[in-house]
Swiss-Prot record:
Protein name: Conotoxin VnMLCL-042
Upper lineage: Eukaryota, Metazoa, Spiralia, Lophotrochozoa, Mollusca
Residues bearing the modification Methionine amide: 63
Keyword hit for Metal-binding: no
Keywords of this entry: Amidation, Cleavage on pair of basic residues, Neurotoxin, Secreted, Signal, Toxin
Expression (tissue specificity): Expressed by the venom duct.
Propeptide boundaries: 20-43
Signal peptide: 1-19
Note, other: The mature peptide does not contain cysteine residue.
Compartment annotation: Secreted
Any one GO cellular component localisation term in the record: extracellular region
Length: 64
């Protein structure tokens, strides 16, 4: 009779400790992926497009 409450308490303690399978899979994928896989290089076309989008209207406004 004493085993049942002990079993229930152990079951309640063990349930939150179980890892989320999706979370562990994402974490393992992130660990395996290196920074070179993340494409951290800045694309020059993006920067030039942003600068052109900002500078051209600014120069047009200054010139009149």
């Amino acid at each position: 009779m004493l085993c049942l409450p002990v079993f229930i308490i152990l079951l309640l303690l063990a349930s939150p400790a179980a890892p989320n399978p999706l979370q562990t899979r994402i974490q393992s994928n992130l660990i395996r992926a290196g920074p070179e896989d993340a494409n951290m290089k800045t694309d020059k076309r993006v920067i030039s497009g942003l600068l052109a989008g900002i500078l051209v209207p600014l120069i047009d406004a200054i010139m009149g």
